[in-house]
Design a protein with these regions (language model features):
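Transmembrane alpha-helices and adjacent helix-loop boundaries
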Residues: 1-217
Length: 217
């Protein structure tokens, strides 16, 4: 491969950025609601469910995401002799990211829910348990946990680079390949700028949401 211009590098890296953005969006879209379900399991009065969920969260938070991605990708073959094609790489990335981040969001939800005072207003309004949760508790919980969620979301932007583990052509993988072929650091510099702008946009968006939800400001 001949020497590339900066514009050519940016064009190739933009394609990788699209994949990184896809990983980011899919992860949030599924891990946020899944995390709430897992939080309910973590707070369940059923000891078996509570124990299973605690073990799951402990494993997800106590082992590297990179390792989890490899288990999700290679697991079907090593455990069940199910052959998977290269198209499964991106799906394995989605699955690995979702189950990992859902565990973190579950603990954030749990701490937010358990910090809420229980039920006097709900009793006055005559709400049942489900109505109390969705109409009174959850909106307040979201306000309380948003800073913690923001931290995880910003971390997710950077973690998308771990998809290179499964040879997914996201931005970091492309930057690494270009840096090797072009024998210079410019692809990494461009990738760093992309990541910084992505994180800046996310931070501004989350700050805007936080202000919108702050009814008392």
């Amino acid at each position: 491969m001949g020497k590339m211009t900066l514009q050519q590098m940016i064009t190739q890296l933009a394609g990788g950025m699209a994949v990184s953005t896809q990983i980011f969006v899919i992860t949030l879209l599924f891990s946020l609601p899944l995390g709430l379900v897992i939080a309910f399991g973590r707070m369940s009065k059923n000891k078996l469910i509570q124990t299973i969920v605690k073990v799951y969260i402990s494993i997800m938070r106590g082992t590297p995401l990179m390792l989890q991605l490899m288990v999700v990708y290679f697991g079907p073959y090593y455990l069940f002799r199910i052959k998977v094609g290269s198209s499964y790489r991106l799906w394995a990335t989605f699955i690995g990211f979702v189950i990992n981040y859902a565990a973190y969001f579950a603990e954030i939800y749990r701490s937010g829910i358990q910090s809420m005072p229980v039920g006097q207003a709900a009793e006055i309004l005559g709400y049942g348990k489900a109505q109390t949760f969705f109409k009174i508790i959850l909106p307040q919980v979201i306000k309380r946990i948003l800073p913690s969620v923001t931290n995880e979301v910003i971390t997710l932007v950077k973690d998308t680079s771990l998809a290179f583990t499964l040879s997914v052509a996201e931005m970091f993988s492309i930057a690494k390949a270009l840096a090797a072929s072009q024998t210079n650091m410019m692809p990494f510099v461009v990738a760093a700028v992309f990541y910084y702008i992505f994180n800046l946009v996310v931070a501004v968006a989350m700050e805007w949401i936080e202000k919108k939800l702050d009814y008392y400001r």
